[in-house]
């Protein structure tokens, strides 16, 4: 783990390039990496320990903390307007800064607010969950939901800096910790057999630094080649087509609770897209080892209806990502109705 904690990666996107710092204690030393001598809006949610946002605010010359309610419901126009209003009331200008401190919801919301406030101001992402550290904190996707349709209104807005402080995972509930690992399993399946092997054989808590860094390197390489998802970045949607459909349907009975987290839904969404039965069996074994669900009860028709609203669906067609074997993938465009036989495969 020590070989990876202390890593600096650089997202190479020309004038929009930025550093990704993976380092213990980096959140309380944000001032070493970023210019904080301006007005700073620190956006967080009620599920994030308050000391993390305060830790950032204390390093700033002039800061305000904006706290939204925990959960996907905060990715709404109403909450977005509230955040923007607080930024305006704080007197923020074009040279000021938004810092997200939290998980994927906070990053999406704060990043989108930064992208549209005065036509775009600086944004720093400080993820505090495994899901956001491993995946959503880099790449520039920001969005809010429209009703039950996820991420349908948004923008590509790259952060100026990403600070990944693994120390913040110490306060993360166990189920949330495991939930985020689904995106790392995805990276292993698509392009990194060694990463997948960690999940099969190792104690993930002992290797979390390596898991984070390997996952970030994979996503970084994809985004650098296809920033706005015109081609190969679509690979990152592996598991998300069915996963988003499951996530959007209300009242799903999960293995442990009513309602599944995003990573749990992605995990379920990946299984039908794995063409090798042997690999599918190995992945189910990994899920059981980690504590991710391998099955759930859902209404197939409702899930299919939700997938019609998927951003990848056009004219009744949808591009899906299939994995024929470990470390390889392909994109395939099929009728949305063609997803029907895949929906009952996770058992």
Annotated model-derived regions:
Residues 2-97:
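ATP/NTP phosphate-donor binding region
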Residues 198-302:
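Active-site segments that bind and position negatively charged phosphate/pyrophosphate groups
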Residues 109-120, 249, 275-276:
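Alpha-helix C-terminal capping segments
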Residues 105-112, 133-134, 244-245:
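Short glycine/serine/threonine-rich phosphate/pyrophosphate-binding segments
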Residues 5, 17, 182-184, 279-347:
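C-terminal charged capping/lid subdomain of soluble metabolic enzymes
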Residues 89, 158-162, 167-174, 182-194, ...:
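Generic secondary-structure signature for well-ordered alpha-helical cores
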Residues 23, 42, 127, 165, ...:
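Residue-level signal for inorganic ion chemistry
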Residues 12, 112-203, 324-325:
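A glycine/threonine-rich phosphate-anchoring loop and its flanking beta-alpha core
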């Amino acid at each position: 783990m020590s070989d990876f904690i202390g890593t600096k990666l650089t997202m190479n996107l020309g004038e929009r390039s930025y550093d990704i710092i993976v380092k213990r204690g980096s959140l309380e030393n944000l001032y070493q990496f970023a210019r904080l001598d301006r007005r700073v809006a620190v956006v967080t949610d009620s599920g994030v320990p308050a000391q993390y946002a305060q830790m950032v605010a204390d390093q700033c010359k002039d800061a305000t903390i904006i706290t939204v309610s925990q959960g996907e419901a905060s990715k709404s126009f109403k909450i977005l307007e509230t955040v923007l209003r607080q930024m305006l009331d704080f007197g923020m200008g074009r040279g000021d800064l938004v810092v997200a401190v939290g998980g994927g919801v906070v990053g999406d919301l704060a990043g989108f607010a930064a992208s549209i406030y005065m036509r775009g101001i600086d944004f720093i992402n400080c993820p505090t969950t495994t899901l956001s550290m491993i995946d959503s904190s880099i790449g520039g996707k920001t969005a809010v939901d429209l009703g039950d349709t996820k991420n349908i209104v948004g923008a590509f807005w790259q952060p100026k800096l990403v600070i990944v402080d693994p120390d913040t995972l110490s306060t993360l509930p166990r189920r949330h910790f495991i939930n985020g690992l689904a995106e790392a399993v995805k990276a292993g399946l698509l392009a990194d057999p060694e990463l997948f092997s960690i999940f099969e054989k190792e104690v993930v808590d002992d290797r979390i630094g390596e898991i984070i860094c390997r996952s970030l390197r994979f996503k970084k390489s994809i985004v650098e080649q296809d920033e706005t998802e015109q081609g190969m970045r679509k690979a990152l949607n592996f598991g998300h087509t069915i996963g988003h459909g499951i996530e959007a349907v209300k009242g799903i009975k999960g293995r442990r609770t009513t309602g599944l987290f995003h990573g749990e839904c992605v995990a379920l969404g990946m299984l039908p897209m794995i063409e090798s039965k042997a690999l599918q069996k190995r992945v189910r074994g990994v899920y059981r080892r980690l504590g991710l669900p391998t099955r759930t009860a859902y209404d197939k028709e409702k899930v299919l209806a939700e997938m019609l609203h998927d951003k990848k669906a056009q004219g009744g067609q949808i591009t899906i990502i299939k994995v024929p074997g470990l470390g390889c993938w392909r994109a395939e465009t099929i009728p949305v109705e063609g997803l029907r036989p895949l929906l009952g495969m996770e058992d």
